[in-house]
Amino acid sequence: MLQVYLVRHGETQWNAERRIQGQSDSPLTAKGEQQAMQVATRAKELGITHIISSDLGRTRRTAEIIAQACGCDIIFDSRLRELNMGVLEKRHIDSLTEEEENWRRQLVNGTVDGRIPEGESMQELSDRVNAALESCRDLPQGSRPLLVSHGIALGCLVSTILGLPAWAERRLRLRNCSISVSYTHLRAHETKANL
């Protein structure tokens, strides 16, 4: 059985400002750096052997802090990027028009075909983050990988691991630098989560 640890990046400036990030980026706050240091301490205790991270800046920085403590290299994987929020990226959530808020709600509240213009669907997100998780099966026996990703991306991944639809992530709300664990059986196509 392979244990895969899932970590959301530390708090960013835009998290604090309630801005939509998606695949756009903002730096970690001092609090976010501290959160990553706390995860790094725990990751070292867990014996993490591989760190696989989204290639966006906020996850890169979180992964760098963890890798330094664990003595691991980082593998960057664009499949772990956040949901592409299209034309709403970089916007303050409180400044959305009624139409824009409806797009956002349709997407995150479970409309199967929900999509923000120029963005991606929850199913597209689910397909790519699940493929990234599956690639952990190719790591050497005894590996303890840690994936560093984003709130909606990880929520979507955990939802599908639990057998829920991709858009059920809304009910899971993973906090900045939270740690979740997925147990993946190497022989059967079966994944279980212990959250």
What is the predicted function of each stretch?
Residues 1-5:
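Extreme N-terminal starter segment of soluble prokaryotic enzymes
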Residues 11-65, 116-130:
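Loop-to-helix element that buttresses phosphate recognition and phosphoryl-transfer chemistry
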Residues 19, 102-116:
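Short, basic/glycine-rich phosphate-binding loops at helix/coil junctions
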Residues 38-104:
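Phosphate-coordination/substrate-recognition cap region in phosphate-metabolizing enzymes
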Residues 60, 130-183:
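Active-site-adjacent alpha-helix immediately C-terminal to a catalytic or transition-state-stabilizing loop
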Residues 184-191:
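Conserved small/polar residues in nucleotide/adenosyl-binding loops
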